[in-house]
């Protein structure tokens, strides 16, 4: 049986490896791929979930790293973080522009506890913001589920399609309940069982080496 897998799509952010690490800490296998990876290849991996990372660009500028609308139509839960959140909204018909006030650092954030992402998260929590663009208008079908004093869309969701956008960085420790949020996505929204361990990977690698050796000897 194929093991459950969450794919992290890299848009050039500084925390990409950390995102993958946090997913693995939820006992879910995770791999990182470039945003240039072909959609058919992603689909063939049969991921349980997809996470879009942050990045240094503005998604509305020519030549910025992007993805196709079809990525959000695979029927797989998708979580966009920072740039990934903005890109999701931009591609699906929302609006992203320069923020009147740049947010950087620990920021008090108010969340909608009815959202699956914020289950068992404090209604008022501290998150790590680092953005100069902001989502000024959410895409059709989305609902705002978190905000700050300067950021009207700190998080948004379209539960019908299992699409989630978070403007902040839940993967860093400065976001006090970030691990819980990622756990809610990976184990709750994506439905991963959380049975993966590092030792399982080593066991599989050993098995593959054994099979390769057996084939070589034939």
Predicted segments — roles?
Residues 67-75:
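Catalytic-core regions built around general acid/base machinery
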Residues 80, 84:
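Gly/Ala-rich beta-loop-alpha elbow adjacent to hydrolase catalytic centers
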Residues 65-68, 203:
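Short, well-ordered alpha-helical scaffold segments within catalytic/effector domains
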Residues 215:
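Glycan-recognition surfaces in beta-rich domains, encompassing non-catalytic CBMs
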């Amino acid at each position: 049986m194929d093991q459950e897998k969450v794919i992290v799509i890299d848009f050039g952010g500084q925390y990409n490896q950390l995102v993958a690490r946090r997913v693995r800490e939820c006992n879910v296998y995770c791999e990182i791929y470039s945003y240039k990876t072909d959609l058919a290849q992603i689909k063939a991996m049969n991921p349980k979930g997809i996470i879009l990372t942050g990045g240094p660009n503005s998604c509305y500028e020519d030549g910025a790293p992007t993805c196709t609308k079809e990525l959000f139509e695979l029927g797989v839960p998708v979580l966009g973080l920072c740039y990934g959140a903005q890109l999701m909204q931009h591609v699906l018909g929302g609006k992203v522009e320069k923020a009147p006030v740049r947010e950087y650092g620990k920021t008090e954030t108010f969340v909608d506890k009815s959202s699956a992402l914020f289950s068992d998260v404090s209604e008022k929590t501290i998150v790590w913001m680092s953005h100069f663009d902001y989502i000024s208008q959410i895409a059709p079908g989305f609902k705002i589920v978190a905000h700050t004093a300067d950021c009207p869309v700190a998080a948004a969701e379209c539960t019908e399609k299992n699409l989630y956008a978070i403007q902040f960085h839940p993967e860093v420790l400065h976001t006090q309940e970030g691990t819980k949020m990622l756990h809610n996505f990976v184990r709750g929204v994506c439905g991963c069982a959380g049975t993966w361990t590092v030792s399982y990977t080593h066991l599989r690698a050993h098995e593959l080496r054994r099979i390769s050796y057996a084939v070589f000897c034939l």
